[in-house]
Amino acid sequence: MKEQLRACILKGIEGCFADGTLTSGEVPAINVEKPAHAEHGDFATNVAMQMAKQQRKAPRAVAEILVAKLAGASDLIESLEIAGPGFINFFIKDGAWRRTLSEIDRAGDAWGKSGIGRGKKVQVEFVSANPTGPLHIGHGRGAATGDAVASLLSAAGFDVQREYYINDAGNQMNTLGLSGLLRYKELLGEKIEFPETCYQGDYMKDIARDAVTKYGDRFLKVSQEEGVAFFSKMGGDLILAGIDQDLQDFGVRFDHWFSEQSLFDEGKVNSAIEEMQAKGLIYEQEGALWFRTTDYGDDKDRVVVRSNGVTTYFASDIAYHRDKFARGFDWVIDVWGADHHGYVPRLKSVVQGLGRDASDLGIILVQLVSLLRDGVPVAMSTRSGEFVTLKEVVDEVGRDAARFFFLMRRSDSQLDFDLELAKRQSNDNPVYYVQYAHARIKSIFDTARERGVEPLFDSVKFELLQTPEDLSLIKKLSVYPEILEGGAVNFEPHRITYYLQELAGEFHSFYNKSRVITPEEPELTQARLFLLHCVAITLKNALTVLGISAPERM
């Protein structure tokens, strides 16, 4: 609807240029927004205020000229009014709103989708947890966010690839190997002083037990270096397989798993450093190599290779992002924990050093999750330092509830996740409230058929949908494509959870005030069934893009 209105306003402005009522000139970007109060119309624009200086007229005078041109010029517009310093308020005809229902029915599963990203290739890299332990709930929020952003971008027409970056080249892998070896020796009877720097979780004992079952005491007889290398590989593989399974159980599947170690094995770290040196962006000082990130607004230059010759994580990130763009992605999106916010300027510097625009790298920061039970905080970790895992949360509340709750707030704001609320089958539980709306509609259709009313949608009389509840529900349906597009380009899946709760609220309000199946008014019955058919399509599409099911019975 907004796009149609923008086109109408543009045509009106061009008409005023043509007839001389306005001086020809550049047309500003036409903003069309929904007013805060319904009495100010369905939409409003400030275009008259934007054009006033160019036209050398008062904003209200420009608005009067435009209103005169637009009045009666479109079958969208019922009436117009000028408000305040020069806003133009639009009241849309009921018939124009009702036409949305035919669009929804025709589009079906494609309702809401757009082609704004057509021809553009995007990579979303998310989770990317070290393969040194199971995923915790913070990773779960990152997984839900990254997966939903990828789905939103796909719905907006982008060609999207989901990628997991395996941090398998750092010192943490040696620590993992040592942890596994010590637990293995302990299990075979050796008295071990287990260092605090090693991984404390019980999963390390599981890895050791697996090694004993498969290999007996073989690794008691090898050097520590060989034992650490073995348990680093075995432990990493087992943990990564567990991570993959937990993510699949959570509804997340990656198109590509990328090993950090492969960057070293294939010489990509060295070649990336050499390229940046050739560009004058990496220099030597005190035996170390530094990247000139201050050239791009960072507060200080960053070390790439230490004076002892050991590369930093930053060196891997330079090579990794160089590799991403070399694979042909137009847009690269990283999903990080909020504790990495200080890392943003240096990565933006790398992207610019590669000759790309800083905006070609999108970074989504994901804040912490606090667990509650009926409003009371839950301990997030055990005495041994094990965090509550994603698997534990999904097993307790279910995949749908977990995903919805993780996506209920902006990713960069802290999230309270109430486990008891997430399990509650009541309207207090937002995911239940939304899913129940979909199931309730399916139940209404079952009831209609039981009463001998078969939905017949080939000649629906939409004009019978005229109550405030009818029209309010239709208006809420009509904004879904705009919500979806905004969620995609701004990386904000919480816009969809907000919208779903609002749409479910409109539906439940409609249902409580309106009779759907009215035997004495068969045409109105068919019109309202069609309206609910469109609500069900929209609920299902919006839930699906978040990776959440739309149950037909609850």
Swiss-Prot record:
Keyword hit for Protein biosynthesis: yes
A family per Pfam: DALR_1
Principal location class: cytoplasm
SUPFAM superfamilies, sorted: Anticodon-binding domain of a subclass of class I aminoacyl-tRNA synthetases, Arginyl-tRNA synthetase (ArgRS), N-terminal 'additional' domain, Nucleotidylyl transferase
UniProt enzyme class: ligase
EC number assigned by the record: 6.1.1.19
Family annotation (NCBIfam families): argS
Record's protein name: Arginine--tRNA ligase
Organism per entry: Geobacter sp. (strain M21)
